[in-house]
A protein has these predicted regions:
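Alpha-helical scaffolding within the catalytic cores
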Residues: 29-43, 243-255, 282-290, 319-323
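Conserved N-terminal glycine/acidic-rich loop preference
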Residues: 258-270, 278-294, 301-339
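Membrane/wall-proximal cationic-aromatic binding patches
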Residues: 14-54
Length: 496
């Protein structure tokens, strides 16, 4: 088993069979300004709080990988607070691994994977719940107590003339204006709280002429302006277009002041069709612009999917999605995390499943699989920061995506009468339709199988080259290595 750094005394381990390629454990960047801006947030974290928003699908809603990443950031850079929470019970869905939620009364809900619901606009958490009943409740119970601190608490709800009032209990303490400096705002309300927190109870109070209480989420942060706040804001089944439906998010985000946003979508964009939709690039660029309108200096990190199977067949659009995200990151001045190749690339999800790191659907990971992903996300941040410390003036750091024998570089768009593909090198704007090219599918000539070697303890490149009757330079070229440094578990292509 390969070990990663300690996570609160527990090693995150994984077998070499997962084919994890640590050459990709970086956030790729395309100019020095973005790298410097990224690194400066961590250099100043002891006096300027770093706020990260992580959007995605079901894995982010449950907080499996983000719990590991958050814990590592807090351990190294200090905790800026717990971050966002939502009452998933009222939305009839599963909760975070870090807390349970329950409700009393009747609640209706909307989620970002659905079409826009003008009657229930969506906020920063990607879900909204609403009740028309006085004395309805939203309850939260944390598995680990939020430690006593000078907390800033923000409740996001529709605070207008027809909203019910609210009683707020932290454990058994009723929050009040005098003791807790409770203030009302257009976004909801805020207050101070110093004690530890394990249970939160929101009780809807009657008010003359009130008609409903509409809840968007709550956030618990530390008052001190230091450390990392890591908000995990996923919605199961959400695709990239879901970001464009968060109509209340911009106003609420100005309260939380995000410095970085990780846009971790893709699976629900390509899974069922095995194709890149013609509108996807436009949706991604609009999502990027939506966050830059909130904070022009925000760091945006684009990611990829992992290897996927759907109904027993490989999802080959994963390659094109990886290349599309890399291309958009270059054009839009974003950072890029190539999880697809880091996680082993094509035809590896079956192995992840066999080793107990992916579920039987070969789409979702298991708990320990997501722990590995969260750990490698944190390590990718750290490796990028180390690169900056060693080479502060480096202009870019890119690692070409791997080529595979089943790689499909073009993206077929569904069309019953024409065989067309979208040229994903072209930028799709609101006014210019996507460029299409008529094609004749080429004959696929299978490439010979590549010989691979998994690095073991004590191995050096020269020893591996000698055993396989090749040279160090050829191995470095075949694997696009920048140095002769290798790590245990790394999979090397052995050239002839």
């Amino acid at each position: 088993m390969i070990s990663s750094p300690l996570f609160f005394g527990q090693e995150i381990t994984y077998p070499p069979a997962l084919n994890i390629d640590l050459n990709y454990a970086y956030l790729q960047f395309y100019n020095n300004d973005q790298l410097k801006k990224f690194a400066t947030h961590f250099e100043n974290v002891d006096k300027d709080k770093l706020v990260i928003l992580h959007y995605g699908g079901s894995h982010i809603q449950a907080e499996n990988p983000t719990t590991i990443a958050r814990a590592n950031f807090h351990k190294k850079y200090g905790s800026g607070g717990r971050g966002l929470m939502f009452n998933y019970s009222a939305a009839n869905t599963y909760s975070s691994v870090n807390y349970s939620s329950s409700k009393k009364g009747t609640w209706k809900y909307a989620k970002s994977f659905q079409a826009r619901n003008t009657a229930l606009p969506l906020g920063i958490c990607g879900m909204t719940v609403e009740t028309n009943e006085a004395f309805a409740e939203l309850n939260f119970k944390l598995k680990n107590v939020i430690t006593p601190e000078n907390h800033d608490v923000f409740l996001f709800f529709e605070n207008d003339s027809i909203s019910y009032d609210l009683d707020i209990y932290f454990d058994s303490v009723l929050v009040n204006a005098n003791e807790h400096q409770l203030e009302t705002h257009p976004f909801g309300l805020s207050f101070k709280y110093k004690e530890g927190i394990q249970a939160i109870r929101l009780v809807v109070k009657p008010k003359p002429n009130a008609k409903r209480f509409r809840f968007y989420g709550l956030s618990v942060e530390n008052e001190e302006n230091s450390g990392v706040v890591y908000h995990s804001t996923g919605v199961g089944a959400a695709a990239f277009r879901s970001v464009l439906l968060l109509d209340k998010m911009p106003d609420q985000a100005t309260v939380l002041k995000p410095d970085m946003v990780i846009l971790d979508f893709g699976t629900n964009d390509i899974l069922s069709t095995n194709k890149i939709d013609a509108n996807l690039e436009k949706q991604i660029i609009k999502s990027i612009n939506k966050f830059r309108a909130i904070n022009p200096d925000i760091i945006i990190i684009l990611t990829t999917t992992q290897d996927l199977f759907y109904k027993g067949k490989p999802v080959t659009a994963c390659f094109a999605f990886r290349d599309l995200m890399d291309s958009i990151a270059r054009k839009q001045n974003c950072l890029f995390w190539n999880w697809f190749d880091l996680a082993g690339g094509t035809k590896t999800i079956k192995t992840w499943n066999a080793e107990g790191y992916a579920q039987n659907d070969c789409i979702h990971l298991t708990k320990k699989g997501y722990q590995v992903k969260g750990q490698l996300l944190f390590e990718s941040f750290e490796n990028t920061l180390c690169l900056y410390r060693d080479q502060a003036t480096i202009t870019d750091y890119t690692i070409p995506g791997k080529l595979y024998t089943d790689y499909v570089p073009t993206v077929v768009i569904p069309n019953p009468t024409n065989n067309v593909v979208v040229d994903t090198t072209a930028t799709i704007s609101d006014s210019i339709p996507p460029k299409v090219i008529k094609v004749t599918p080429p004959k696929v000539v299978p490439k010979p199988a590549l010989k691979k070697y998994v690095v073991k303890k004590g191995d050096t490149l020269s020893q591996i080259a000698e055993r396989n009757r090749t040279s160090v330079s050829k191995i470095m070229k075949a694997n696009r290595l920048r140095s002769d440094r290798i790590s245990i578990g790394q999979v090397l292509v052995i050239p002839k």
